[in-house]
């Protein structure tokens, strides 16, 4: 059995919340000296030897603790204790501290107060039990008083009504008792203060203690709360005992209770909520970008680091860069301010298609024609037409279909004429595609693309009746306000006329005289080459239109482009025949590449 074990202990104390506070106990040396010197004698009310027992127990406890400290601190600790100016007496001890230390419920060096928070005028229970079956609560009377939890402790003053109301309920066997306590009639000045509920347990044979019981008597009764004291009193019972509750803090409402570990969340403003949402979206987009980048790397495709840039802006930037490079390396081409506009130029389409052809030389002709059609469709989608323009386009398409039915018969009769012209264009393309020096290769590719595109335009307009050629060409280039407009139209008509004349001669003479007018000839004084260089400079304005367009001009351009694309299949078949004929007669030619020829003949962009 543990020496000085508590006879009666508190098993449960009700509260709204429990807080832990560290407590600084008084110096042990002053307590021992006050006991040994007899400064505050301990006298029991009934003259029982409990006072001497308490004194002996306290001395034994405190002397043992003092010896441990003296071994650690030695002389330094003794000098420090001797220099103390204040001496504590037993009356200044906190009853809660004395109870926890004497009953060995806590150790002095790590003493902690467990503060119980209760609501004003709300009852809470304090449960007690006896650790010895010989003690029966039916033989005792319980009385409660209220003290301030301070050093030195003092009673809570009142005038008429006691601030503490209580009701005790004893169990059937008498080993347990529950005291329902309610604290009231305290002003707001006491809110936040801590109190102690002292439970006086007195035998029925002795009078009950008064409400203003001295602190010394309470401390004496706390010392008698031990099983050893009960055994020493046998066969006489213990007459007075005291049990001190845990410190109590009183609040007026439950909302005032500060819950430890649960912070109060401040209501977020609209700006904070919006910022949090944007951060979540940004984090989600970053994760998606990583997945997309991984997919690009798996398929060996270059990942665009600016995925939110619009495709239209990128196309415009590429077209402007290509037009600027074409002006610097054009080789005799004329550049004006319209090249910097957002309208796509022919050079950008030619360069893009040329790059595509170099990477796909082994593809079939059908796949390449499908890619060209898809590129034209993408360009058409980038232009926004109004409702009125769409109606005019439908009307033009209907006229185009009617016109195509008439020209299908004419195209069968003009099969021989187209073969000679396509052979000359094929020979020029083959000459341009021969190996040259690396410094001049880029310029020759651009010039060959320009020539091939112009030859395609000439071939397309050959199917237009002669009576309508001049009007259609004039309307198509009406947007160019240049001094060379009339000369451009005249040169265009002359070229068409020369092509028709050459086709007639080649059909009668078997194409023997076609070598003199070959565009791909490398003679020093070739008239066709000089005419091509002159015409190339004049036609540059035609393929670089201005940014401000007239709705009627767009319709005419659409009409002419649709008409040229409708006869694309017949032109390619005729060009293949002309290449086979031209291989037997021209002394400068090598075997042409049909895939490069069809790729270089680009359709006109629809503006």
UniProtKB/Swiss-Prot annotation:
GO MF annotations in UniProt: sequence-specific DNA binding
Q: Where is the composition biased (Low complexity)?
A: 334-363, 383-451, 568-582
Instruction: Supply one GO CC term from the record.
Output: nucleus
User: Segment Disordered: which positions?
Assistant: 62-84, 334-451, 568-602
Q: Please note every region of biased composition (Acidic residues).
A: 364-382
Q: Name one GO biological process term.
A: regulation of DNA-templated transcription
InterPro entries in the cross-refs? CudA-like (IPR040430)
This chain belongs to which protein, by name?
Developmental gene 1062 protein
